[in-house]
Amino acid sequence: MGIQFQEGKQFDVIALGRACIDLNAAEYNRPMEETRSFTKYVGGSPANIAIGSAKLGLKVGFVGKIPDDQHGRFISSYMREAGVDTSQLVIDREGHKAGLTFTEILSPEECSILMYREKAADLYLSPDEIDAGYVRSAKVLLISGTALAQSPSREAALKAVSLAKAAGTKVVFELDYRPYTWSSREETSVYYTLLAGMAHIVIGTREEYDIMEGASASGNEQTAKMLFAKEPELVVIKHGVDGSYAYLPSGETFRAGVYKTNVLKTFGAGDSYASAFLYGLLRGYDIDQALRFGSASASIVVSKHSSSEAMPTLSEIKALVEEQHV
């Protein structure tokens, strides 16, 4: 049995958080110091998830803040053309810029990112820029962990969560840990713990949960038990090549393996996983089926150059799931 969502809402998913610029190395197998050409894409975990969800046919909205410049216009235009409602994409008028992420692809196993997040526009989304009616109009409100990293974005995210819960909207917390934005792991732990306890569904890697717990070696069952003492109804813990696990308060556990693919790079997998997993839940899939859907989507994205543009179609995911049984 899957998660139950309130019907009669305008949107399936509204994502809140960062929409920024990814500059992915166009030259493979060389360090960033020697890389001279990059390809520009829209990036940022919640933006990627929104784009991926829209590509799968969900009705998707986005809440965020972008700069009043060429990068901001590129982000807004791309997301709109991808099928995401951008009516709540606020334009920053105070000179803040888009976050920039450069990627390095040394090999399929060795990829890295370099982020520039100082005074990024998305972190200046304020509580008074949250439209209550808009937030209430979704079956799911997805919050990215990076939105909690600084004020006023932190307070805006928490306001949106309160509004959503009061309206029967399910809150999904995608941990999305990016050390460049936080002042310390201790600060991250405080705010992750706060929002994870308020969310209905929590999704993250084992390493991200360890940061939240301030632990170096916690077990999945311990993590799930801790969260089920609060409000979560479903906890998803990803273990990279070892697959992903989902836990219910009833004690039921589900697992999906990893689909074989020709890996080009490692980034983007989590965002594609989340969009396809949520698609499955919203379409009434059983949890184990939704896990496989997320895993298949992640495998497709890591075989391609971008994150946002590589988000797969429904037919691509279904074909891979039918081809391989994991």
UniProtKB/Swiss-Prot annotation:
InterPro entries: Carboh/pur_kinase_PfkB_CS (IPR002173), DKG_kinase_firmi (IPR022841), Myo_inos_IolC (IPR030830), Myo_inos_IolC-like_sf (IPR023314), PfkB_Carbo_kinase (IPR050306), PfkB_dom (IPR011611), Ribokinase-like (IPR029056)
The name this protein goes by in its record: 5-dehydro-2-deoxygluconokinase
Source organism, top-level taxon: Bacteria
PANTHER family assigned to the protein according to its UniProt record, in alphabetical order: 5-DEHYDRO-2-DEOXYGLUCONOKINASE, HEXOKINASE FAMILY MEMBER
Family: Belongs to the carbohydrate kinase PfkB family.
Keyword list, A-Z: ATP-binding, Kinase, Nucleotide-binding, Transferase
Documented EC number(s): 2.7.1.92
UniProt pathway: Polyol metabolism; myo-inositol degradation into acetyl-CoA; acetyl-CoA from myo-inositol: step 5/7
One Pfam family recorded for the sequence: PfkB
Gene Ontology molecular function: any one: ATP binding
Entry's Gene Ontology BP terms: inositol catabolic process
Disulfide bonds: none
Source organism of this protein record: Shouchella clausii (strain KSM-K16) (Alkalihalobacillus clausii)
Described purpose of this protein according to its UniProt entry: Catalyzes the phosphorylation of 5-dehydro-2-deoxy-D-gluconate (2-deoxy-5-keto-D-gluconate or DKG) to 6-phospho-5-dehydro-2-deoxy-D-gluconate (DKGP).
Reactions it catalyzes: 5-dehydro-2-deoxy-D-gluconate + ATP = 6-phospho-5-dehydro-2-deoxy-D-gluconate + ADP + H(+)
Gene name, Swiss-Prot/TrEMBL: iolC
